[in-house]
Amino acid sequence: MSKVKSITRESWILSTFPEWGSWLNEEIEQEQVAPGTFAMWWLGCTGIWLKSEGGANVCVDFWCGTGKQSHGNPLMKQGHQMQRMAGVKKLQPNLRTTPFVLDPFAIRQIDAVLATHDHNDHIDVNVAAAVMQNCADDVPFIGPKTCVDLWIGWGVPKERCIVVKPGDVVKVKDIEIHALDAFDRTALITLPADQKAAGVLPDGMDDRAVNYLFKTPGGTLYHSGDSHYSNYYAKHGNEHQIDVALGSYGENPRGITDKMTSADILRMGEALNAKVVIPFHHDIWSNFQADPQEIRVLWEMKKDRLKYGFKPFIWQVGGKFTWPLDKDNFEYHYPRGFDDCFTIEPDLPFKSFL
């Protein structure tokens, strides 16, 4: 049979997806984290893989799903949080724009799976299935009550799950995980379709969402999930030493306030007394696409006058950040390769060919 007749849609998908194959899985496994440091990789959206000097591996908000794929239904799902927020009827055109850089089914070494809240782009059934099928049988699933309810509903044993609320601390090898207050007001209006939010006092945030502070021997990482800006960031900054802070950034569409702005990201970094602030989430949705360089420009305008003690860092999905080695860098670039040029004799017609 000729090639063009043997190839199918399914064979095409399997040969190209996930786009990075197991490249990043292998990179993470091979990484030897030096004493006094921690390494992390951006998995897309707010997904992070954190690795400590003691070899602890944890992932947070690793999501392997997608957004809109068809114009079939022109209307938004009834009762969707964005419909509640802005009184809209039209379909939200949120297409996923980020490639899949980590294969969940190639994960073998992992010590904990965490989620900040139960929105679809922060918790994933495929990740849960892959860890249950291929990894150690004692890997815990850690998150607020709504996340644990989802995991259990998917088939993760209850005894493998740990419910956390602000103030709780969980130890995973040499990483101390502190659950802190979340400020995700969108989570509070994520309700069953038949339940009204108007005129009703929202239930507590603590069952729905948490922020995390990861204390490693090499430094600390603050993960804010989908939190909006809050004055309480300053309280967290007063109570904890925070080296690196991650904040959900995006260009909010008209009538919507769901992501922090460039000014909010700077206020967050200042309030937390962080050393480095890194925006994320702006990569994933086509309709919230934002330019993180705006944060850098605004920081340059304000840093001397306001005496900022932090720097912004502009990341790329799939890229690695090592604290404190990268603390003075402003922008990530993927490895460019060719560092071994001219280690063998070039095969060219003549020396000045190129």
UniProtKB/Swiss-Prot annotation:
InterPro entries: L-ascorbate_6P_UlaG, Metallo-B-lactamas, RibonucZ/Hydroxyglut_hydro, UlaG-like_MBL-fold, UPF0173_UPF0282_UlaG_hydrolase. Keywords: Cytoplasm, Hydrolase. GO terms for molecular function: L-ascorbate 6-phosphate lactonase activity; manganese ion binding. It comes from the Bacteria. Signal peptide: none annotated. Induction: Induced by L-ascorbate. Repressed by UlaR. It is found in: Cytoplasm. HAMAP family: UlaG. NCBIfam families: PRK11709.1. Belongs to the UlaG family. This is Probable L-ascorbate-6-phosphate lactonase UlaG. It comes from Escherichia coli O45:K1 (strain S88 / ExPEC). The gene is ulaG.
